[in-house]
Amino acid sequence: MQKLIEKANTLMEALPYIRRFSGKTIVIKYGGHAMADEALKKSFALDVILLKYIGINTVIVHGGGPQINETLKRYGIVSQFVKGMRVTDEATMGVVEMVLTGQVNKEVVGYLNQHGGRAVGLSGKDGGLLLCKKLLQEVKNEQGVLETVDIGFVGDVVDVDSSILVTLEAGGFIPVIAPIGVGTGGESYNINADVVAGKVAAALKAEKLILLTDVSGVKDQGGNLLSSIALGDVPGLIEDGTITGGMIPKVTCCTDALTGGVHKAHIVDGRIEHAILLEIFTNVGIGTEIQA
């Protein structure tokens, strides 16, 4: 009986959040270990479908780095990286697009539909969803002078036409986006999935942006999880070394989304089953919330 009462209390804790977020949109970046573990894949699918059933629109943006690496290796293509970004020549871009749109996207869509959802897969090229420009990197040469480096078909989002997403949401569908964009000449670009999620969330004026990661969230210098960060505190946390390394671009993605009109952003440990529900529908949450 006690377990039943605990379940009822959990539902009651979620009720005010369900009321608050019903009819709103949440954009979720799906990547990392959550895409590889079968139990986590199932809990992710069930979380997303439950959100849709209770009236919360969800838009999924997925990654696919490990799958790309595996396929490139099979084709004998060796990748080079500049400041953590893959140099993407024409041959590499062909593989990247094939894997993200033809393999990973369809797997995510299939898994959601298998568990009762109505997911529709698309890339940024569909309906002109993601218009891109070439992303150039600045690196220091041997003399310590900054040089601009062309890293190929790697793009940055300059415009999001969210009309196709609004149409899909209105029809009861769950959009699943592969992070491939299109240039003004029709060329394909590979885009960082976190960036795509943030840009899409801003375009939709989403209630929340959630980044599923392989870490518990942002930690202080003592290793303790920071459950909440104010937007205005982020620059100082980067400057004092609290936010470092690969967490900087994720937090920057969140702050850009907040500046663009998203209400809250969350960095959540995707290795925890039902991480999305735990972050949204509990008073404490499990990750780091960033708010304006």
From Swiss-Prot:
GO terms for molecular function: acetylglutamate kinase activity; ATP binding. CDD domains: AAK_NAGK-C. Its main location: cytoplasm. HAMAP family: ArgB (MF_00082). This is Acetylglutamate kinase. Its EC number is 2.7.2.8. GO terms for cellular component: cytoplasm. It comes from Geotalea daltonii (strain DSM 22248 / JCM 15807 / FRC-32). Gene3D superfamilies: Acetylglutamate kinase-like. It is found in: Cytoplasm. It catalyses: N-acetyl-L-glutamate + ATP = N-acetyl-L-glutamyl 5-phosphate + ADP.
